[in-house]
Design a protein with these regions (language model features):
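Helicase P-loop NTPase motor core
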Residues: 44-50, 113, 285-288, 293-387, ...
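Conserved phosphate/pyrophosphate-binding and hydrolysis machinery centered on Walker-type P-loop NTPases
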Residues: 22, 71, 98, 123-127, ...
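Conserved helicase C-terminal RecA-like lobe
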Residues: 10, 172, 176, 360, ...
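Short alpha-helix plus adjacent loop in nuclease-associated cores
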Residues: 104-112, 263-270, 297-298, 391-413, ...
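N-terminal pre-P-loop "Q-motif" helix
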Residues: 18-32
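A basic/glycine-biased coupling hinge at the interface between accessory DNA-binding modules
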Residues: 2-11, 15-16, 33-36, 41-44, ...
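Conserved helicase motor core of SF1/SF2 NTP-dependent helicases
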Residues: 44, 232, 236-315, 319-324, ...
Length: 555
């Protein structure tokens, strides 16, 4: 239900809203009309400026919160912005559109993706799902899997989608290049599998939304009319399709505020286009530029070192960070000949600090850029008997047991996802062989249906034999869960799946430590589900799965 906005009931004095900001921050927060580029150096208080700008729009300018959109790059940043705005304004913060690019696109597509030929009940595939499709495509095209590996191929497809190049266009651009021609075939097969499964990948969320807005003037105008004031954080990290999305939505009122720092652009390998921020004034005529150069996080010695390094960039917007935090300690720079020499010296320095009583091991941390760099440090820690803990590892949602239960939930929610059905049909083991699954897949293909639909018609398929009863048992169990899903929340449904399928019993057959770890992960998953339902009124299983998909692959 849309909130009725009556700003005159509680409007604050402008000085109350902006009094905690420095003069330049105030300038940025109070500039509300037309395109605005806020060049925000590291530690310069950009989130503070954005949240106060939103509060200023509502309380001073009388803008309806419903008409404000703030785009972030992570769910964590979106939640932080929501919380801060909620503390600043007395009413209406819940109506502000604060979300990531991907969450925003899901929100739009859930309403209108049927205009593009999809069912609104679509599934969002994660990286593992994508790799499975690539392997299938490579096999069906009879290509060498060693020459056409999933990771690089997904990179090619993602790069194409980020540049809004769809399969047919990619094929045209391939020309006579043999490798590109094969990649075009894989891309085409990959996209067909997604469409057949009523599924999208993360790049599709953006690409399909842009296509939807371009092809449907009524939808575009509706969002332009609603989202009259748009703010985008980390603008230096936007790619071509994200730029086009923002350009389209801001096309009527032109009240676009972007915050970023070209000096912090490090995601070119993910498709980020630095020209989006460098050419902002040319792209949006009449744009104002405000520079936030006062740093609140570091000392001047650190900032001068950073300024000296970044000054070597050939193409950048001039800015010079400074601080009132004093000079601080001098920055040391040490060059090592080898990775092992570096690790040896770093571990020796840590041991010296500990032996002198200045620190404990738990006070020390080693940061590295790539996972491969950890090996040298780990080996030196072991050699010198230094206790350590490696932070990171497997993403929670990529763990086998979590993927299994997610596949159950997806199958219960929608039987159109063949990957999920294939994953769980023998989890726990049901004795359904690959030959049987192949026959089901052939039947499904010949009759233009999904795998689960073929399973429902198993009695009509010749050559299945005794396996038919096992298939019917699986189908019946899913149908029971579907009925339960109408009455239970996701946490309760997970509990039923674990108990009724015998999944927990299978875990108990594993080694004690391994079984316990998996059980704890499943309990944590149930807790996450319970928390989601507690914080979202009228939440449905589809909503929870959407939340998991966005959190798992974005953050």
């Amino acid at each position: 239900m849309r909130t009725v906005f009556l700003p005159f009931l509680w409007r604050k004095n402008v000085s109350d809203i902006l009094q905690s900001l420095n003069p330049v921050q105030k300038e940025a927060a109070s500039c509300t009309e037309g395109p605005l580029l806020i060049l925000a150096g590291a530690g310069s208080g950009k989130t503070r400026v954005l949240t106060h700008r939103i509060a200023y729009l509502i309380d001073e300018k009388g803008v309806n919160p419903w008409n404000i959109m703030a785009i972030t790059f992570t769910n964590k940043a979106a939640q932080e912005m929501r919380d801060r705005v909620d503390r600043l304004v007395e009413f209406g913060a819940e109506s502000i559109w604060v979300a990531t690019f991907h969450s925003s696109c899901v929100r739009i597509l859930r309403r209108y993706i049927d205009r593009l030929g999809y069912d609104n009940h679509f599934t969002i595939y994660d990286t593992d799902d994508q790799k499975s499709i690539i392997r299938k495509a490579v096999k069906e095209l009879d290509l060498d899997p060693k020459q056409y590996r999933e990771g690089p191929l997904l990179g090619v497809i993602s790069a194409a989608k980020n540049e809004m190049i769809e399969p047919q266009d990619f094929e045209t651009q391939a020309g006579g290049d043999f490798r590109m021609c094969q990649e075009a075939k894989i891309y085409k097969a990959y996209q067909k599998t997604l469409i057949d499964n009523n599924a999208v990948d993360f790049d599709d969320l953006l690409l399909l939304t842009v296509r939807l807005l371009r092809e449907n003037r009524d939808i575009l105008e509706a969002y332009q009319e609603r989202l009259r004031y748009i703010m985008v954080d980390e603008y230096q990290d936007t790619n071509s399709v994200q730029f086009e999305l923002i350009r389209l939505i801001s096309g009527k009122y032109h009240n676009l505020c972007v915050v970023g720092d070209d000096d912090q652009s490090i995601y070119k390998f993910r498709g980020a286009d630095i020209t989006n921020i460098l050419s902002f004034e040319e792209t949006f005529p009449g744009a104002k530029v405000v520079k936030l150069e006062q740093n609140y996080r570091s000392t001047n010695n650190i900032l001068e070192a950073a300024n000296a390094v970044i000054a070597n960039n050939a193409h950048r917007k001039e800015k010079h960070l400074w601080s009132e935090n004093g000079e601080g300690k001098e920055v040391s720079f040490i060059h090592y000949e080898t990775a092992y020499g570096e690790a040896e010296d770093v571990i020796d320095k840590i041991q010296t600090e500990v032996h002198m009583g200045k620190h404990q091991y738990q006070d020390c941390a080693i940061l590295y850029r790539t996972n491969a760099q950890s090996r040298a440090f780990e080996e030196k820690c072991i050699k010198k008997s230094v206790p350590y803990r490696l932070v990171g590892g497997v993403n929670f949602y990529q763990r086998q047991e979590i993927k299994d239960i997610l596949a159950y939930l997806k199958t219960i929610d929608s039987g159109r996802d063949d990957l999920s059905v294939t994953r769980i049909v023998n989890v726990p083991k049901r004795g359904i062989g690959q030959v049987t699954l192949n026959k089901l897949a052939v039947y499904a293909s010949e009759h233009g249906m999904r795998l689960f639909q073929a399973m429902e018609q198993v009695e009509q398929i010749s050559g299945i034999g005794k396996a038919a009863d096992k298939i019917k048992g699986f189908v019946n169990q899913i149908m029971v869960f579907r009925a339960l899903a109408k009455e239970l929340d996701a946490a309760e449904l997970i509990e039923s799946i674990l108990e009724q399928t015998g999944y927990l019993e299978e875990l108990e057959k594993l080694e004690e430590d391994k079984a316990q770890a998996k059980q704890e992960n499943l309990e944590e998953f149930q807790n996450k589900a319970a928390d989601y339902y507690a914080n979202h009124d009228e939440a449905a299983l589809t909503d929870f799965l959407e939340e998991v998909a966005l959190v798992a692959d974005i953050d």
